[in-house]
Amino acid sequence: MREIKGFINGEFVGSGGFGEIYSPATGELVCQYHKTSIEQVGEAVDAARIALKGPWAGYSIQDRVDILYKIADGINARFDEFLEAECLDTGKPYSLASHIDIPRGAANFKIFADTIKNVGDEAFHMPTPDGTGALNYTVHKPKGVIGVIGPWNLPLLLMTWKIAPALACGNTVIVKPSEETQLTSTLLGEVMNEAGVPKGVYNVILGIGREVGEALITNPGLDAITFTGSTATGERIAAAASVGVRDSSLELGGKNAGIVFADCDMDKAIEGTLRSAFANCGQVCLGTERVYVERPIFDEFVQRLKEGAEALKLGRPEDPETNMGPLISKSHREKVLSYYQAAVDEGATVVTGGGIPDMPEDLAGGYWIEPTIWTGLPETAKVVQEEIFGPCTHITPFDTEAEAIELANDTPYGLASSVWTENVTRAHRVAAQMETGICWVNSWFLRDLRTPFGGAKQSGTGREGGHYSLEFYSELTNICVKL
């Protein structure tokens, strides 16, 4: 059984208390972690502050670029270790993590290394009454000590998506991973040391959110907080960040819709919807939990999606044929099952799934659940309105384009949407009316990482990606020089 410690000021530190991590695939105890104490949270913030004003402050942009490339190379050099840790933590298939989580976790550092190299400062000449003029120019400076609170669904990918731009801009970070998935954040500490990152630049605290997470977000030593997770937790973090007028970047929940028109490429629409509904066992903030299908193809679409869902193979993470893993925890499965029951109670037609699958004896203790499809519910139904974060989706027919747009936008969330049609003019027209941070056309989970990512409405504040991330992690000073 593994044992992990927090990472503070370049060293792994123990504590007096322990927490436990269980394998989502088997339910077995696989790791003990040292719970970071409240005092150690303060020490991490202090270490980050000292590093910010100390050696890290002397690094040029090119120095930081070189460091980021070394971190990326370090992750790739230990690819198998990160892969094993990520899949042990989450239960997700190796086939998924090896193609998405670990490569993107490394690539994020190179992406933002390249981005920071190409960010220019503005300069303007202005006239003055005496005719000599003045020069105005901007200077980018680090924002300071950043609290990074990560989710459990894509632990390494989404953590490095925040850490990489923060370090690129010269900040220091204290990372609080989810208590469910802490292995890769601590393993990254080893890579940071190997890459020559100064002590205190990267710190990791371990424990549950209401204890160490709360201690972190309320610490006055933080200059900004970035968070990915539920809307409810995001609201709490926003409130904490407002004390002291600190910045916060929040990527929150979604109740994402797909619109499928009768002229779509059916094969592509089915494949894309299957991925968006069931990838990572539905534990993706960008997942599609609502699908609106034009009536002439409704029955065919439902039948083909059913066949696709029933063909998914649940199994051990390391099995190359496994393409859907378990839910993250027993408590999360209970939550998702409560939604499955609510759908039935409200009169849903269960097209497929709706329960716990029969698994081999060695996996019977895991947190497995069936991929589920419903039809027949009104828009007011609980499973149509609330984010479930499980492998399930509800399909509704529509008759007109205007109706589909209205239905898709009828939610307090605004993270993502997708449109499936071969009519390019309609695709652009409908996509422009989606009240979401991103809208895919004939695709899903595809994005140039230089573009902005984030949610509208209750799905978050701020944008991440490319120079949009750098704006959050930088302070700008305008310098005006009289000539």
How does the language model describe each region?
Residues 26-32, 222, 313, 340, ...:
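Conserved C-terminal structural/oligomerization subdomain of aldehyde/semialdehyde dehydrogenase
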Residues 224, 232-378, 441:
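ALDH superfamily catalytic-core signature
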Residues 27, 64, 86, 170, ...:
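Residue-level signal for inorganic ion chemistry
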Residues 121-268, 398:
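Rossmann-like NAD(P) dinucleotide-binding subdomain of oxidoreductase/dehydrogenase enzymes
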Residues 1-134, 328:
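N-terminal Rossmann-like NAD(P)+-binding subdomain of aldehyde/semialdehyde dehydrogenases
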